[in-house]
UniProtKB/Swiss-Prot annotation:
The name this protein goes by in its record: Oocyte-expressed protein homolog
Annotated Polar residues bias: 8-18
UniProt organism field: Papio anubis
GO-annotated biological processes: actin filament organization; embryonic pattern specification; establishment of spindle localization; establishment or maintenance of apical/basal cell polarity; positive regulation of double-strand break repair; positive regulation of double-strand break repair via homologous recombination; positive regulation of meiotic nuclear division; protein storage
Keywords: Cytoplasm, Nucleus
Major subcellular location class: cytoplasm
Domain notes: Contains an atypical KH domain with amino acid changes at critical sites, suggesting that it may not bind RNA.
The family this protein is said to belong to: Belongs to the KHDC1 family.
Superkingdom of the source species: Eukaryota
KH domain sequence ranges: 49-110
Length: 149
């Protein structure tokens, strides 16, 4: 037989998710990430950025987790980019710095990739819906089974 003191003592060692969240809130915020202009990027091209918006889920597809692909994209395109979350996480603001021709090329490339990912997601959802319907049809005992030739 277990007494109440023993159970209370064993529960003290365990942390609930709420306790963990409180401990995280007590920690100081990390310092802001400071970006230094790369040596290959001219200062005068920081003056007139190109800004456009995409859905937040697309930013994860395009730039990878934690925006890890941005430095490589910047290097290959010779443009600087910032990706900031706006509109309570539904949209991201993409700012492209560089020569106007480079800005337009980067925007075009990102919009083409976004279109590809939208189509891919729509096809995946359509396939899931089709599979669900086929499983429901196959499990229905009243549906006539077509003989396979």
């Amino acid at each position: 037989m277990v007494d109440d003191a023993g159970t209370a003592e064993s529960q003290r060692g365990k942390q609930t998710p709420a306790d963990s969240l409180e401990q995280l809130r007590m920690l100081p915020l990390p310092p802001p990430q400071i970006r230094i202009r790369p040596w290959w990027f001219p200062v005068q091209e920081l003056r007139d950025p190109l800004v456009f918006y995409l859905e937040a889920w697309l930013a994860d597809e395009l730039f990878g987790p934690d925006r890890a692909m941005i430095p490589e994209m910047e290097w290959t395109s010779q443009a600087l980019m910032t990706v900031d979350i706006v509109d309570s996480g539904n949209l991201v603001e993409i700012t492209v710095f560089g020569r106007p021709s480079v800005q337009n090329r980067v925007k075009s490339m990102l919009l083409c990739l976004a279109s590809f990912h939208r189509e891919h997601r729509a096809r995946a959802e359509k396939m899931k819906h089709l599979e669900k319907n086929l499983k429901a049809h196959a499990s229905d005992p009243h549906s006539p089974q077509d003989p396979v030739a």
